[in-house]
Amino acid sequence: MSDSVALDSFLDKWRSRWPEWGLLERFVAPQSRATAVAWFALVQEFDDILNVEGDPLPANAKLAWWGEELRDWDARRSRHPLGRLLEPVRAPWGQLADALPDLHEARMGKADTDAAFAALARHAGAMAAVEAAMFGSPRGEAARAIAAQVLAERWQAAGVAVLPATSREGDGTASMQAWAAVLLERWPRHAGTAPRRVWAALARARFEAARATSELRATRPLKPLALVWHGWRAARG
């Protein structure tokens, strides 16, 4: 497989998971669109590693590999296809590599919501720093917004297992609903760089739709007009 085909495969994989992006990428500056999709594809890799089911050892090994790869990007070398688009960006890749091991700890059960956010603080801060280097100065509490989006993704992927101990009282569905409400309260709207704000608007809409269903991890079809409206507002900040 050629490098170009391998890169397209990773980008298409992310687009297939976020098909609504086709409606929203118009709100991202044209010169930033390719980089944004490549970056979000990498972020999705980290989310998948965090939310792995079963034996975590292969995921942990993959995380260690990514740490080495990101440090190579700092040295202007790359092996992964995504590096074709991302490695040339002068971003703090080493800072992100240093934060990746925190995902091991973030995967473990937490006592409360504060602890869940704290476990992701360094990782989210490193991602916010990379995004600032890529797309310009962020708005608002960029790192906190990223952490909230990661936890919302984890809520949908891991179910009751992700709930902090203080949120596991009584019925599982009710507990999931209650913690989703807490995450939404702590998720700053329209924070971060423009591409992140647009993606977060989509992620938040999905999260709210999943929360509204009786099957908590099921996602109802999102209404295109409403989604475009949210994307436009997010882009404007």
Q: Could you tell me what each predicted segment is?
A:
Residues 1-68, 72-84, 96, 100, ...:
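Catalytic cores of Mg2+-dependent Asp-rich isoprenoid enzymes
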Residues 89-93:
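Long, charge-dense
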Residues 154-160:
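Conserved, surface-exposed functional patches that form binding/active-site neighborhoods
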